[in-house]
Amino acid sequence: MATQSHRSKGAQGPYDGGTAGIQSAACTASVPPAAIASICVGPGTWAEHLDYHGKGVSVQGALGPDGTVLEFGAGDGSLAFQLLDALGDQVERYAIVEVSAHLREMQAKRLQGFSPKVQWLDALPEAIEAVVVGNEVLDAMPVKLLHRMNQTWHERGVIWAPDIGQYAWQDRPTDARPPVAIEGDHDYLCESPVQASAFMRTLAERLRRGAAFFIDYGFPAHEFYHPQRHMGTLMCHHLHRSDADPLTDIGAKDITAHVDFTGIA
């Protein structure tokens, strides 16, 4: 199932059963090999989140001598603006990996005051010596849906149902399993973040020096795969409204799923 990026979340879905705070996963690699950490931060600007003292990780502290920041999927450029404004001359180069021409145009307009430092890339570089940042990137990557039904695991897919004239779910048996065992034998739906996991593996392989910070909505694995979270975390957002049905208004909704920070780390 493909998802689209969404950058204005606010409402909690019915799956939360509490709070799903904004978290950042930090992969620090001052010198290889990289060490992995997860940190939880409170309200404030993204620049403040990424300068989270007491955990030994900050954009300022991780910047190399060439002062390079690499942002993956910069949205409207808000995070880039805040970092460039907060860090000033410490940033010599701010590279943005962005494939959308429309978003590039928005970013260029917002960041025109920093134009000598900013450049755009079409793909992740083969070798990275930089501070890598991402705001609500991982939760917008495609996921697989795994459905335990009658004690048998299935992968959920989408078919066209001509009898009802619309798309519908179809479950097929699979050997795939969630990364942790789900207690109980009740029906259970969850996401498998295959693309986000592959992205992080690629990033870890290419990050020669620096750090990676990701701000997102998510949980550690024991909360993400809690037996009571039996409907998963997949949500749709459109016109400031949220629902859990990606098969309606197809193409008009942003589709997201919370992040398993344990798996990402």
Labelled PLM ranges:
Residues 1-72, 76-127, 146:
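Rossmann-like AdoMet
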Residues 124-265:
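Class I S-adenosyl-L-methionine
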